[in-house]
Amino acid sequence: MMVVFVLENATEKLRGTLTRWMIEAKPGVFVGSLNALVRDKLWGMIPDHAPKGALMICSCNNEQGFQMKMYGIPTRSIADLDGLQLIKIQQ
């Protein structure tokens, strides 16, 4: 399954761990093909090692073809509109 992580201020430890499984396409942007177990274990490391926030986008069998999870970004949130995930910007 295709997975993309977008991280803000990730620690070197987390970046090193992610590069074992994924390509760092740009600083803080990791792309790879992971199984669900590895994806969930890596996502579980995010709160301790990327305190400013993170976004995960992964392929999913739904209308959009992907799903999103977000952590620690107070100005944005994920809104569900009839099964479609959208990014809501807080003002």
Q: What are these model-derived regions, one by one?
A:
Residues 2-91:
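Basic nucleic-acid-binding interfaces
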